[in-house]
Structures are given as structure tokens and as C-alpha cells.
Amino acid sequence: NTGGKAPRKHIAHKQAKKSSAAAATGGVKKPHRFRPGTVALREIRRFQKSTELLIRKLPFQRLVREIAQEYKSDLRFQSQAVLALQEAAEAYMVGLFEDTNLCAIHAKRVTIMP
């Protein structure tokens, strides 16, 4: 015995009931749904592989200009300066979420809270 899960036992009458129910409703098959958390884990893996910025550039640029306006009016930004700010902001947020996740795991929770 190699361990692991035992093979599932298929019950014939349950399968027959399902197929007859689909035939009774006119063959309308309900849409496929992944189990809760599966899509989230897939997205986590996808975003961890990628290096592109996740916040849209123009909304971030508007936010930077809005915040800078409070300190000095008529400021101009090089495009590289805004990109550097965005890289720093996203790196900070990723670190914050990593720490938040560790705190949630420590508290025996799965969901992170504000």
C-alpha cells in the first residue's frame, strides 16, 4: 500500500438519477464551478510568476499628482519618476500583504482582515 486517498466508489443509481434529471430539464447543463479557493490559488501562482505592475498606470499617476498638489501646486513629473513611485508602492503593498498573511496564519485564520 502506497498510502494516499482510496479510490472513489461510484454508485450507479446516483449517476442514473443525475442524467435523468438533466434530461427532464431539457438537457440544460449547469455551468462548471471550481471549488472555493481553487481560482484564488491559481491567481496567486500567476501573479507571483509575473513581474508587470498590477495597478493601472494612469489612475496611479492621477493619485500621485493629487497628493503632490497638496504640498506644492504646478509640479511636473518625469514619467520615470511616476514609474519609480509605482514600483515602490507595489513592492511595499506586496510586503504588507505577505506580513498580513503570516499574521492570519498565526491566528489560525485563512482570511485576511483590514
From Swiss-Prot:
Comp. bias (Low complexity): 18-28
Record keywords: Chromosome, DNA-binding, Nucleosome core, Nucleus
GO terms for cellular component: nucleosome; nucleus
Region (Disordered): 1-32
GO molecular function: DNA binding; protein heterodimerization activity; structural constituent of chromatin
Subcellular location: Nucleus; Chromosome
InterPro entries: Histone-fold, Histone_H2A/H2B/H3, Histone_H3/CENP-A
Biased composition (Basic residues): 1-17
Keyword Calcium appears in the UniProt entry: no
Entry superkingdom: Eukaryota
SMART domains in the cross-refs: H3
Entry keyword DNA-binding: yes
Family: Belongs to the histone H3 family.
Protein role: Core component of nucleosome. Nucleosomes wrap and compact DNA into chromatin, limiting DNA accessibility to the cellular machineries which require DNA as a template. Histones thereby play a central role in transcription regulation, DNA repair, DNA replication and chromosomal stability. DNA accessibility is regulated via a complex set of post-translational modifications of histones, also called histone code, and nucleosome remodeling.
Subunit and partners: The nucleosome is a histone octamer containing two molecules each of H2A, H2B, H3 and H4 assembled in one H3-H4 heterotetramer and two H2A-H2B heterodimers. The octamer wraps approximately 147 bp of DNA.
Protein name according to UniProt: Histone H3-6
Species, as recorded: Stylonychia lemnae
Name of the gene this protein is made from: H3-6
